[in-house]
């Protein structure tokens, strides 16, 4: 990994390569002739004025596409899109996280992005942290080019293997804690630790594990207290909910991950985010259900210490690494964990993905009538026939249609649609955004989605139909689909009827909520 400077250093960690058209003062080294020999008619054109300074990164604007070819989308988050990108000069592949400036609606949002870049540069060179190759800013977005972790998410690798042991879980956890111990020793709290944020560098069996997504991370000093509630619901520590926390909150999140690794479900569970938070504050950790009777005393002891409700009494990263269960050649047994654990782990991963897939189906499977109506609406709003709609055209168009939206809702609709942050929305973006503003659980939308999966119109979704539909989206293998059927299939007939489908779709999904700052009343 390349050298980096901590925030505040005057040197750039990743200076942009000089473009082929970069200007050099006449008379500088390598000039073809001295100023005295150049006639006025042959004098070079004056140097271009420097690029304006970007308001987010505070450095000259630069077009990331002049250096990288941006390819297919890899993922989408609250603030932007991650795409595959290729360095034009070397052909090397990276991941490019594009953060739309239109989505950065508050001063805190801008500061979060700026700090994310600073923290990633600060942690550069650490083997367990995804490397930031460069940060670029143009008029519409900030682009973070990072090393590509092509091996996928940690839990997906475990599921694909089909079996694992306490010893393997111990080894994984040791790697995760080593990474976070390094972050803490360098004055960084991650604040959003969860399985999805640990990726494998490649598909190789022994590929290194990398921590990613430092968008909520902060620098900290010893004794400093943080008060904003951030993170992903299942993994948030109780002191975060009480608005008084430090680096110990990361240990809690890893403790939740360990609990899931050992039994397949989160320790704090409810049908809503509010319910999960209350469960976290109660702090009761269940070791009575199976498979805990077959899990070693050492593993349970470490989970208890990591999930201690009092952060002052919680085990530190250093002490976790010295715990007998986690030490290399320690006491973690090599006997396979119960197959039921893997089944539950699959369900925990697959259910979230199935619901996301179904929501995408709802957004993408509009009836011809709806599409025709929305197409006409788009045309009528596009007053200058440019093929795109500005926020002003959107506002006026909605008012003409008698749609009563507040200014904030109009802005929300615009921001939801404008994925590339260029200030306008095209037809496809408009369709997606219009659906986004509707309630996704409306009866007709749910029925449309159900029909999409029910290929033979039998009134049931079978394993084969679900597999076919989800394979089209490249989401799951057959085993995961079987697990989903059994989870949703309330009457145990081996298939999903409409009532069961609706119940699944309307069930609380806390992870669908934004992970950003929350106002929580408990």
Swiss-Prot record:
Residues binding Ca(2+) 3: 454, 456, 458, 460, 465
Record's catalysed reaction(s): L-seryl-[protein] + ATP = O-phospho-L-seryl-[protein] + ADP + H(+); L-threonyl-[protein] + ATP = O-phospho-L-threonyl-[protein] + ADP + H(+)
Presence of the UniProt keyword Thylakoid in the record: no
Region (Disordered): 1-58
Matches recorded under PROSITE patterns: EF_HAND_1, EF_HAND_2, PROTEIN_KINASE_ATP, PROTEIN_KINASE_DOM, PROTEIN_KINASE_ST
Membrane topology per record: Lipid-anchor
Task performed by this protein: May play a role in signal transduction pathways that involve calcium as a second messenger.
Domain observations: There are 3 contiguous domains conserved in the CDPK subfamily: a kinase domain, an autoinhibitory (junction) domain and a calmodulin-like domain. The autoinhibitory domain (332-362) inactivates kinase activity under calcium-free conditions.
PANTHER family, per database record: SERINE/THREONINE-PROTEIN KINASE (PTHR24349)
Protein name: Calcium-dependent protein kinase 14
Species per Swiss-Prot/TrEMBL record: Oryza sativa subsp. japonica (Rice)
């Amino acid at each position: 990994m390349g050298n980096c400077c901590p925030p505040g250093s005057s040197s750039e960690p990743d200076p942009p390569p000089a473009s082929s058209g970069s200007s050099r003062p006449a008379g500088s080294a390598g000039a073809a002739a001295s100023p005295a020999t150049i006639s006025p008619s042959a004098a070079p054109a004056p140097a271009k004025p420097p690029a304006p300074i970007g308001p987010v990164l505070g450095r000259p604007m630069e077009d990331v596409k002049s250096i990288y070819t941006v390819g297919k989308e890899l993922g989408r988050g609250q603030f932007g899109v991650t795409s595959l990108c290729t360095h034009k000069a070397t052909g090397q592949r990276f991941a490019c996280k594009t953060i739309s400036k239109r989505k950065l609606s508050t001063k805190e949002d801008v500061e979060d992005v700026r700090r994310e870049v600073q923290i990633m540069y600060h942690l550069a060179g650490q083997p367990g942290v995804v490397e930031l190759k460069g940060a670029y800013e143009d008029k519409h977005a900030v682009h973070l080019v990072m090393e590509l972790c092509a091996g996928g998410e940690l839990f997906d690798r475990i599921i694909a293997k089909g079996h694992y042991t306490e010893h393997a879980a111990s080894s994984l956890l040791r790697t995760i804690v080593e990474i976070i111990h390094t972050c803490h020793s360098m004055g960084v709290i991650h604040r959003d630790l969860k399985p999805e944020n640990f990726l494998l560098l490649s598909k190789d069996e022994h590929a290194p594990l990398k921590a990613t997504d430092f968008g909520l991370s902060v620098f900290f000093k010893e004794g400093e207290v943080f008060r904003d509630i951030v993170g992903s619901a299942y993994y948030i520590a109780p002191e975060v909910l009480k608005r008084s926390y430090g680096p110990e909150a990361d240990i809690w999140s890893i403790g939740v991950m360990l609990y899931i690794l050992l039994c397949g479900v989160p320790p704090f569970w409810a049908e809503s985010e509010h319910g999960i938070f209350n469960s976290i504050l109660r702090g009761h950790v269940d070791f009575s259900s199976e498979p805990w009777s077959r899990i070693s005393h050492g593993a349970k002891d470490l989970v208890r210490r990591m999930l201690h409700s009092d952060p002052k009494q919680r085990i530190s990263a250093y002490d976790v690494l010295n715990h007998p269960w986690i030490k290399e050649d320690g006491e973690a047994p090599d006997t396979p964990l119960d197959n039921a654990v893997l089944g539950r782990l699959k369900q925990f991963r697959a259910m979230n993905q199935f619901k996301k897939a179904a929501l995408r189906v709802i957004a993408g499977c509009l009836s011809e009538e709806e599409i025709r109506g929305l197409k006409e609406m788009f045309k009528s709003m596009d007053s200058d026939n440019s093929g795109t709609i500005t926020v002003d055209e959107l506002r006026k168009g909605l008012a003409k249609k008698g749609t009563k939206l507040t200014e904030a809702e109009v802005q929300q609709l615009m921001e939801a649609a404008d994925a590339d942050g260029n200030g306008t929305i095209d037809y496809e973006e408009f369709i997606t955004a219009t659906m986004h503003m509707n309630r996704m659980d409306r009866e007709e939308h749910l029925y449309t989605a159900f029909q999409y999966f029910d290929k033979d119109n039998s009134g049931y979704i079978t394993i084969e139909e679900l597999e076919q539909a989800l394979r089209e989206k490249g989401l799951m293998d057959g085993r995961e689909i079987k697990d989903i059927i059994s989870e949703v299939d309330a009457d145990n007939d081996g298939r999903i009827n409409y009532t069961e489908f609706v119940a699944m779709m309307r069930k609380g999904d806390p992870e669908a909520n934004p992970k950003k700052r929350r106002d929580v009343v408990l």
